[in-house]
């Protein structure tokens, strides 16, 4: 089954493709089908993911899978949340993973509580007007490290310290990270939902 991924993020594609391949699902980025990015005007992960999935399905004619994910820092009232990808731009930096990490570490300087959660909300639709979208949420709680560690992953992985492993996501082998990450958890839920309702 071909499923359009409502994202142009190559990191998300690689991570999700490895998780969905056992189901016989081939993920294709919407950009590879000539489709641009959907607007993300909402304040919650689920609303943005649903908007992206419907947009991709409408413009490709294929079932669609969308992920809206982000970092929610307790000391910042859950921010940056849905604005995670643009976090660095709030502090005068260009958009990008390295700048996001840099800005976060600068803002966390002197902050005692380093507790944070990575959240991934996956939404799948069979068509743009699917009345019963599949929704899966994965969440991992950890702490923001004081400096980047590790070379793997993307986004905030180098500073998302997971106490149960004693490492950041970027220090974990990819198969361990994928099994225990926020996206890994939401993907496992989504796979179960797809098996139950679509296959």
From Swiss-Prot:
Primary enzyme class: hydrolase
Record field: catalytic activity: XTP + H2O = XMP + diphosphate + H(+); dITP + H2O = dIMP + diphosphate + H(+); ITP + H2O = IMP + diphosphate + H(+)
Pfam assignment, any one: Ham1p_like
Superkingdom of this protein's organism: Bacteria
Gene Ontology biological process: nucleotide metabolic process; purine nucleoside triphosphate catabolic process
EC numbers: 3.6.1.66
Keywords recorded for this protein, A-Z: Hydrolase, Magnesium, Metal-binding, Nucleotide metabolism, Nucleotide-binding
Binding site for substrate: 7-12, 69, 154-157, 177, 182-183
SUPFAM superfamilies from the UniProt entry: ITPase-like (SSF52972)
Cofactor details (free text): Binds 1 Mg(2+) ion per subunit.
Chloroplast listed as a keyword: no
Role noted for this protein: Pyrophosphatase that catalyzes the hydrolysis of nucleoside triphosphates to their monophosphate derivatives, with a high preference for the non-canonical purine nucleotides XTP (xanthosine triphosphate), dITP (deoxyinosine triphosphate) and ITP. Seems to function as a house-cleaning enzyme that removes non-canonical purine nucleotides from the nucleotide pool, thus preventing their incorporation into DNA/RNA and avoiding chromosomal lesions.
PANTHER family (alphabetical): INOSINE TRIPHOSPHATE PYROPHOSPHATASE (PTHR11067:SF9), INOSINE TRIPHOSPHATE PYROPHOSPHATASE/HAM1 PROTEIN (PTHR11067)
Binding partners and assembly: Homodimer.
Protein name: dITP/XTP pyrophosphatase
Originating organism: Paracidovorax citrulli (strain AAC00-1) (Acidovorax citrulli)
């Amino acid at each position: 089954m071909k499923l359009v991924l409502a994202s142009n993020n190559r990191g998300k594609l690689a991570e999700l493709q490895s998780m969905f391949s056992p189901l016989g699902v081939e993920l294709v980025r919407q950009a590879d089908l000539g489709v641009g990015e959907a607007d993300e005007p909402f304040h919650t992960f689920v609303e943005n993911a649903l908007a992206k999935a419907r947009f991709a399905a409408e413009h490709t004619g294929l079932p669609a899978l969308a992920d809206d994910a982000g970092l929610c820092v307790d000391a910042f009232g859950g921010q940056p949340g849905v604005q995670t990808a643009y976090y660095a731009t709030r502090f005068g930096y260009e958009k990008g993973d390295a700048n996001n990490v840099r800005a976060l570490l600068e803002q966390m300087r002197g902050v005692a509580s380093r507790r944070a959660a990575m959240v991934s909300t996956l939404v799948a639709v069979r068509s743009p007007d699917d009345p019963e979208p599949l929704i899966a949420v994965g969440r991992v709680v950890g702490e923001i490290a004081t400096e980047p560690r590790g070379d793997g992953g993307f986004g905030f992985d180098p500073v998302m310290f997971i106490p149960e492993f004693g490492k950041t996501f970027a220090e974990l082998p990819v198969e361990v990270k994928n099994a225990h990450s926020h996206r890994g958890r939401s993907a496992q839920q989504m796979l179960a939902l797809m098996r139950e309702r679509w296959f």
